[in-house]
Amino acid sequence: MKQYLDLMKKVLEEGTPKADRTGTGTRSIFGHQMRFNLQDGFPLVTTKKCHLRSIIHELLWFLNGDTNVAYLHENKVSIWDEWADENGDLGPVYGKQWRSWGAADGRQIDQLKNVLTQLRQDPDSRRIIVSAWNVGELDKMALAPCHAFFQFYVADGKLSCQLYQRSCDIFLGLPFNIASYALLVHMVAQQCDLDVGDFVWTGGDTHLYNNHLEQTQLQLSREPRALPKLVIKRRPDTLFDYRFEDFEIEGYDPHPTIKAPVAI
């Protein structure tokens, strides 16, 4: 994951000081891309320990179309708590948009089911896309989508995916985002009888919060270790039937956790 450390270093050295919604302040660059060949290992940051339970359960929660934190709480995941209301609701965030996008004519569009159909029936299509950026519902969301738009691509029997992330918290958020979408590519590839290709991450406003700079320097002082391997132990009937127990990460040997505050 040297690419990730290189991005941190670039933002520290070249980033523009900017104000932000949270009032914390950032160093920011605009426009950056990283490519991860998923055949080379699972792209999970090794220079600090990442909370795998949160990454996996959050993705399963998205795939279920859920937008209430109750499921996350049942599985000891608290990463969305700061934005939930008193009932645990977040409004029409990722799960709602992925599984039940509200069309102008009243239809509810399951974008992920459409993606699976396209990959099986027309894998050369340039329209195999999921968007979470529903302009008509942004004001109802507890947090506007950061990872907003992703596209699948098939070549030589391999499935690749590119994500556009309009806003990226490099220290806390990005390791989760990379691992989450890499996991999704593996799951979709299994369901569509494809091998995995590349995960391409593209960032818009890509930033380090000012209260993460000390932690960033600590992380940059550490040497990356070998990437782990993802093992999917079962092939369920559909993309929406995976369970936490279906996944195993082999050979993950990270440096210790580095704690940092969340900018809300």
Swiss-Prot record:
GO terms for cellular component: cytosol. It comes from the Bacteria. Its main location: cytoplasm. Pathway: Pyrimidine metabolism; dTTP biosynthesis. This is Thymidylate synthase. Belongs to the thymidylate synthase family. Bacterial-type ThyA subfamily. Catalyzes the reductive methylation of 2'-deoxyuridine-5'-monophosphate (dUMP) to 2'-deoxythymidine-5'-monophosphate (dTMP) while utilizing 5,10-methylenetetrahydrofolate (mTHF) as the methyl donor and reductant in the reaction, yielding dihydrofolate (DHF) as a by-product. This enzymatic reaction provides an intracellular de novo source of dTMP, an essential precursor for DNA biosynthesis. It comes from Pectobacterium carotovorum subsp. carotovorum (strain PC1). DUMP binds at residues 21, 126-127, 166-169, 177, 207-209. Its EC number is 2.1.1.45. One of its GO terms (molecular function) is thymidylate synthase activity.
